[in-house]
Amino acid sequence: MTEQTARRTVVITGAGGALGAALSRQFASEPATDLVLSDLSQASLDATLAGLPEAGGEVATLLADVSEIEQVEAVVALANERFGRVDVLISNAGVLSPNGRIHNLRTEDWEHAFRVNVLGAVNGIRAAVGVMRPQHAGSIVLTASVSGLTAWSHAAPYCATKAAVIQLAKVAAVEYARDGIRVNCVCPGTFLSGIHAELPKEALDAIAGRHPLGLGSAADLVGAYSYLASDASRWSTGSALVVDGGYAAP
């Protein structure tokens, strides 16, 4: 993209979650932007679609499991075939891990976290660069976490996988810079979403107390993605943009 006003295509995985839905609304509201949204759940995708502004660009959807490369390639291919290019990939699909000390967690817990959080991001990069390299342009934004920079007890698989995503963004940034492709990641702190709805108030208060600015919302995060996807960040690659309400500051 040489001009921010040129029409662009944005692909978002994990579009059915709280952050994915907020990102979909954000990019749908930006001018000259067409979207391809993907998620594992049709019901979640339908809910995201229902919340999009009517005045936005075209939107296509496709169900996909990001741990399967063929399914991710199909999402990117849909974007390229329908809109003629892929300018931005937001690799946002991810899972939490069960709570537990390292020795108590099952092998399956580790494998599931790595397949979705790490392999899912790898598959997104693999699929996107296949289209972006011939364009000699593109921005890939991965969803990492402040948990990849700090330690959360009883959440080793999640912390380890998000640390891997941060390093993956750095390596991919170096590998694809000469192809005109930028790769960055966003490291959110804890934000209110559906997964917190059933937590008791004292648990929420304890989590909020670790964030000097308190708990955020998905709406507090979308600006970071919008920036990294835009020409305003054209000299940024390999960065981990922390948006965490000050959690990592102390």
Regions picked out by a protein language model, each given a short descriptive name:
Residues 96-99, 150, 213, 226, ...:
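Short C-terminal tail/terminal secondary-structure segment
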Residues 100-102, 109-111, 196, 207:
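Substrate-binding pocket helix/loop in short-chain dehydrogenase/reductase
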Residues 130, 174-175:
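Alpha-helical segment proximal to the catalytic Tyr-Lys
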Residues 145:
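Residue(s) in the substrate-gating loop at a strand-loop-helix junction
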Residues 210-221:
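A conserved structural motif in NAD(P)-dependent oxidoreductases
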